[in-house]
UniProtKB/Swiss-Prot annotation:
Organism: Brucella abortus (strain 2308)
Keyword hit for Hydrolase: no
Keywords: GTP-binding, Nucleotide-binding, Repeat, Ribosome biogenesis
Lineage: Bacteria, Pseudomonadati, Pseudomonadota, Alphaproteobacteria, Hyphomicrobiales
Record family assignment: Belongs to the TRAFAC class TrmE-Era-EngA-EngB-Septin-like GTPase superfamily. EngA (Der) GTPase family.
Subunit structure: Associates with the 50S ribosomal subunit.
KH-like domain sequence ranges: 388-472
Protein's name in the database: GTPase Der
Chain's role: GTPase that plays an essential role in the late steps of ribosome biogenesis.
Annotated NCBIfam families: GTPase_EngA (TIGR03594), small_GTP (TIGR00231)
Residues given in the record as GTP 2 binding sites: 218-225, 265-269, 330-333
Record GO terms (molecular function): GTP binding
Length: 483
């Protein structure tokens, strides 16, 4: 295995549950009693395309040096020293305790890279705990539910970002590209047609066997619950003309054309100024949590009064959260001049939500069941794009052509040099460009690259992340491949 992760944290935060999730079997004893795990346990683990070893540890305890708790703590400290990185687990539902703060300091002193894992994030009231987690100084918390398997894709991406692709895929790639520099000849090789895609089979971009998680959001009374009842074929959710009937984020299992779906109906999301009573504040927080655990978010708009300010705010939130949005223009049965109205709605979608070009939008009637299949076809396609992975070879062949056609501008009389590009994550697609002076790169050129990626690699309707950094040549230090 290429690297080792130690799962640490105070007792009863879900470390052993996460260990079992990563190992794929119930190897660790799990109970509600603190201190169930007394010895550190190490096992081969897998998280999607990542293969590694994981260490389950006793809960960190403050105790006298001659006590059992002290020996458990010593086991944990030994695990930290053996590991390449630490998964520091907190209980988002319970919030940050003094013990969390004490042992976060100990983990920081170890100098090991850390992913802050906010477990039990599916629970009501966990939102406050995740916000409080920032005070630990371990970076942004990664919300998961180890028990239910939610948030695992984000945990995978956090590990890759922490250790770097070269580290986490070291064994898989040690036989890959030669030890070269980015000379014109090397760039020419990248642009050639004879380079195989090393990632195509090694990292499958899409797994249609896993349930697709969909959140259905929108303003109050847009028809979200009616739509879900039509999908399920039963009156599972309370509906009516009164705005705000749905208080909680409610989940339901469904199957569409053989594809398993987890549906989340959410409370209607209002402007903050109108969120007065405590219960409604909790409902909005529940909706935000549903969005974060979803993969695709269907934004239900009332076609008779679309694109209110709240609609745009909801869409912007979904895009900033990196989820895959699809718009459903509901109550289409009430529209008379449908062809003209639809053309107008498509134009407004492109104009009012320019941050995601090609956003998919479908007219439906939740009450009559019209347009549901078309909506789901667009949901599945958007989900596939959201999971898309492009090999480094293809990206750099494209980048070389882009630079030749439109090089970066000169800043303060000095030309910016773009060296190479790689994809660092999916869900949504995220890319890193290595260049000479990242801070000086105009945002207009960054948008130019994003738009080019979207068009060339057929990625409409999903957020695309692109960051700039200064780094060494990605091929430096690799052993030259012998022919």
């Amino acid at each position: 295995m290429g690297f080792t992760l130690a799962i640490v944290g105070r007792p009863n935060v879900g470390k052993s549950t996460l260990f079992n999730r990563l190992v794929g079997r119930k190897l660790a004893l799990v109970d509600d009693l603190p201190g169930v795990t007394r010895d550190r346990r190490i096992h081969d683990a897998k998280l999607y395309d990542l293969k590694f070893q994981v260490i389950d540890t006793a809960g960190l305890e403050e105790a006298a040096n001659d006590s059992l708790e002290a020996r458990m703590r010593a086991q944990t400290e030994a695990a930290i020293s053996e590991a390449d990185a630490v998964l520091f687990v907190i209980d988002a539902k319970a919030g940050i305790t003094p013990a969390d703060s004490t042992f976060a300091e100990a983990v920081r002193r170890s100098g090991k890279p850390v992913v802050l894992v906010a477990n039990k994030a599916e629970a009501r009231g966990s939102e406050a705990g995740m916000y409080d987690a920032f005070q630990l100084g371990l970076g942004e918390p990664c919300p998961i539910s180890a028990e239910h398997g939610q948030g695992m894709p984000d945990l995978r991406d956090a590990i890759v970002e922490l250790l770097g692709e070269e580290r986490v895929f070291a064994e898989e790639r040690q036989e890959e590209a030669a030890d070269e520099v980015f000379t014109p000849a090397a760039v020419g090789a990248l642009v050639g047609d004879d380079i195989e895609d090393p990632d195509a089979e090694e990292i499958p971009a899409y797994d249609a066997t896993k349930p697709l998680r969909i959140a259905i959001v929108g303003r109050p009374n847009a028809g979200k619950s009616t739509l879900i009842n039509t999908m399920l074929g039963e009156d599972r959710l309370l509906t009516g003309p009164e705005a705000g009937i749905t208080r909680d984020s409610i989940s339901a299992d469904w199957e569409w054309h053989g594809r398993k779906i987890n549906l989340f109906d959410t409370a209607g999301m209002r402007r903050k100024a109108r969120v007065q009573e405590k219960l409604e504040k909790l409902s909005v927080a529940d909706s935000l949590r549903a969005i974060r655990f979803a993969e695709v978010v269907i934004i239900v708009l009332d076609a008779t009064i679309p694109f209110e300010k709240q609609d745009l705010q909801i869409a912007d939130l979904i895009i900033r959260e990196g989820r895959a949005p699809v718009i459903a223009f509901n109550k289409w049965d009430l529209i008379e001049d449908r062809q003209m109205v639809l053309a107008d709605l498509y134009e407004k979608t492109a104009r009012l939500l320019p941050q995601v070009r090609g956003l998919r939008a479908v007219p439906i009637s939740g009450e009559r069941g019209q347009g549901i299949d078309k909506l789901m076809e667009n949901v599945v396609k958007t989900h596939e794009i959201w999971n898309r992975r492009i090999s480094t070879g293809r990206l750099n062949r494209w980048l070389e052509g882009v630079i030749a056609h439109q090089p970066p501008p000169a800043v303060s009389g000095r030309r910016l040099k773009v060296k190479y590009m790689t994809q660092v994550k999916t869900r949504p697609p995220g890319f890193v460009v290595s260049c000479s002076r990242p801070d000086a790169m105009p945002q207009s050129y960054v948008r130019y690259l994003i738009n080019g990626l979207r068009e060339t690699f057929d990625m409409p309707g999903v957020p695309i992340r692109l960051s700039l950094r200064t780094s060494d040549n990605p091929f430096a230090g690799r052993a030259k491949k012998k022919k």
